[in-house]
């Protein structure tokens, strides 16, 4: 306190200094809090990126192996599809059961390792991201653009397409369920009442 300052002025001066110091501390706390939040966000982004890279590396590592196994899966599928299920021979029946069990176990192993089968149902809409059209046929059972038949199942690995499903697609103009209705014929403006053919003109003056 100087000779000119009163005790009240001295107290006010000290209070002003304290107020400024408090404001400075508040700004520092806010800055530290913002920095901590940014560090936390960066850590979370780093964690997610590491997980994504790990999944990508895992998918890449087994992709070639999975693709090599698809041939075996296709052969098993064809074998079960062509098996004589009405055979009375116990040996043939047991053989068919064995092939079906092997195919089921292989598909189970695929699914456990992230390899998902793409086998669209009849009538399902063609998806260019998952399907490959190898032929088009007119159909009265499936609307145009729908899957008529799966010629070879496709597969995707952890969201990545390994092989598209080879399918036959209903051609344009197919009249299956869901096909757009034919537009109604426009009325003939020259038709007489009750008829749809052109009426006669009055040629009298």
Swiss-Prot record:
Compartment annotation: Cytoplasm
Keywords in alphabetical order: Chaperone, Cytoplasm, Stress response
Subunit note: Homodimer.
Assigned protein family: Belongs to the GrpE family.
Biased composition (Low complexity): 177-195
CDD domains: GrpE (cd00446)
Designated name of the protein: Protein GrpE
Transmembrane spans: none
Function comment: Participates actively in the response to hyperosmotic and heat shock by preventing the aggregation of stress-denatured proteins, in association with DnaK and GrpE. It is the nucleotide exchange factor for DnaK and may function as a thermosensor. Unfolded proteins bind initially to DnaJ; upon interaction with the DnaJ-bound protein, DnaK hydrolyzes its bound ATP, resulting in the formation of a stable complex. GrpE releases ADP from DnaK; ATP binding to DnaK triggers the release of the substrate protein, thus completing the reaction cycle.
Gene behind the chain: grpE
Keyword check for Chaperone: yes
């Amino acid at each position: 306190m100087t000779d000119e300052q009163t005790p009240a002025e001295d107290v006010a001066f000290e209070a002003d200094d304290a107020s400024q110091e408090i404001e400075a501390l508040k700004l520092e706390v806010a800055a530290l809090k913002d920095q901590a939040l940014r560090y936390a966000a960066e850590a979370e982004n780093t964690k997610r990126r590491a997980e994504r890279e790990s999944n990508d590396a895992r998918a890449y590592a087994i992709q070639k192996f999975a693709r090599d196994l698809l041939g075996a899966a296709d052969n098993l599928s064809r074998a079960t599809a062509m098996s004589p299920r009405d055979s009375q021979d116990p040996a043939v029946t047991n053989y068919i059961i064995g092939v079906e069990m092997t195919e089921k176990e292989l598909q189970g192993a695929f699914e456990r390792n992230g390899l998902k089968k793409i086998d669209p149902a009849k009538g399902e809409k063609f998806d260019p991201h998952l399907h490959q059209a190898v032929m088009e046929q007119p159909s009265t059972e499936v609307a145009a653009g729908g899957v008529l038949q799966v010629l070879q199942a496709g597969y995707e690995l952890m969201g990545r397409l390994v092989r598209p499903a080879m399918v036959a697609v209903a051609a344009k103009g197919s009249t299956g369920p869901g096909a757009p209705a034919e537009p109604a014929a426009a009325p003939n403006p020259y038709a007489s009442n009750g008829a749809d053919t052109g009426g006669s003109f009055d040629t009298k003056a």
